[in-house]
Amino acid sequence: MARYTGPVCKLCRAVGMKLYLKGIRCSSPKCAIERRNFRPGVHGQARQKLSEYAIRLKEKQKARWSYGVLEKQFRRTFSDASRATGNTGAKFLELLERRLDNVVYRLGFATSRAQARQWVNHGHFAVNGRRVSIPSYRVRPGDAITVMPNSAAFVKEALEAASLPQAPKWLEANRETLAATVKALPEREDIDTPVQELLIVEFYSR
């Protein structure tokens, strides 16, 4: 499945909530949800009764669009989670949170996950002193994340522009030196992505 290249604000409207896909614009009055809080399309304002399948599909799409992951990679991540011990849904979200592009976003080093993914692709970040250009790279406790010296200027601009709170407790960030450490694996209560992971488990288990 090809990556979606259309207006990302339509994705937020499709699921009826902010997915924060456009960075600082999502926190401004220009946000599409603030202006047109209904589904895109001719029948967007019509009342709609969703089937059980549609409810689960919507929840899956909400998570996939939030993290900016293609379907094939999203399903592969779910397969990894289902083979692990413990709660499959919580493990699935943990694996998504550990993606390097998501970690860069959580640290406030980028204003959106899409921007973080692009910057990782372009080799602007290093893990344990080695440049990493794979957005899906999974960080582990003890990993040190740094910004490449030539990339510091625009990362600082992103920090100033972003309205993100402090990094989650499983990450330790020094926004002055643009360095961070992964302190632990993320727990379910550390993840604020607004999804019901049980519905995603049910979708892939049908």
Swiss-Prot record:
Annotated S4 RNA-binding domain residues: 98-176
Keyword Ribonucleoprotein: yes
Annotated keywords: Ribonucleoprotein, Ribosomal protein, RNA-binding, rRNA-binding
Pfam family, one: S4
GO-annotated molecular function: rRNA binding; structural constituent of ribosome
Gene Ontology terms describing biological process: ribosomal small subunit biogenesis; translation
Alphabetized InterPro entries for the sequence: Ribosomal_uS4, Ribosomal_uS4_bac-type, Ribosomal_uS4_N, S4_RNA-bd, S4_RNA-bd_sf
GO cellular component, one term: small ribosomal subunit
Assembly, per entry: Part of the 30S ribosomal subunit. Contacts protein S5. The interaction surface between S4 and S5 is involved in control of translational fidelity.
Stated family: Belongs to the universal ribosomal protein uS4 family.
Function: One of the primary rRNA binding proteins, it binds directly to 16S rRNA where it nucleates assembly of the body of the 30S subunit. With S5 and S12 plays an important role in translational accuracy.
Protein name: Small ribosomal subunit protein uS4
The organism of origin for this protein: Gloeobacter violaceus (strain ATCC 29082 / PCC 7421)
Lineage: Bacteria, Bacillati, Cyanobacteriota, Cyanophyceae, Gloeobacterales
